[in-house]
């Protein structure tokens, strides 16, 4: 059975530029694998309505920055469809703590007490995981589902059809995606992964100031990385 475009709950600009992917056989296979798991009682994260959350919060023509993760968090109540992000009132994971520490060092912004990165997404930061789903308690369990074909297409489409996007690639897995990006049109920033397992090699990368300096130099409004700022905002 073919997938019907009208049944895919994703922001309309993404549906248009990615419609060839949604209608491809591999995408139907992804859907079938997820349905099979759910029918067998496996819990999948994030919830189905949040699988395309990154795309719904950051339309195709609004993307300024891409931060690439590997796969969603696999513990209960963590995954929300945004790489590195966790919902309000959920304990901030170690990698995100280190991201906040680097922002503090780089820009002097106080570390927030909340790990919800929706504020970044609404400003144009596409928080993209290479795999968009995971089975509960099993990290990277959907890496061979076909999601990476889809998200590689997302990166290539952004590279080809847009310009002046900042791609932040952290860790060897993400760095390997640089081959999908036209470095003449975009800024590619690479660093060690923010995970504590990387031994602190992420610190000092200054990606957040480099990102904003690049955007400003291209006449594009910079990202406000201060999550504390959201308390007084109407969205």
Curated annotation (Swiss-Prot):
Signal peptide: none annotated. GO terms for molecular function: uracil DNA N-glycosylase activity. Transmembrane segments: none annotated. GO terms for biological process: base-excision repair, AP site formation via deaminated base removal. Its main location: cytoplasm. Its EC number is 3.2.2.27. The keyword DNA damage applies. Keywords: Cytoplasm, DNA damage, DNA repair, Hydrolase. GO terms for cellular component: cytoplasm. HAMAP family: UDG (MF_00148). Excises uracil residues from the DNA which can arise as a result of misincorporation of dUMP residues by DNA polymerase or due to deamination of cytosine. NCBIfam families: PRK05254.1-1, PRK05254.1-2, PRK05254.1-4, PRK05254.1-5, ung. This is Uracil-DNA glycosylase. The gene is ung.
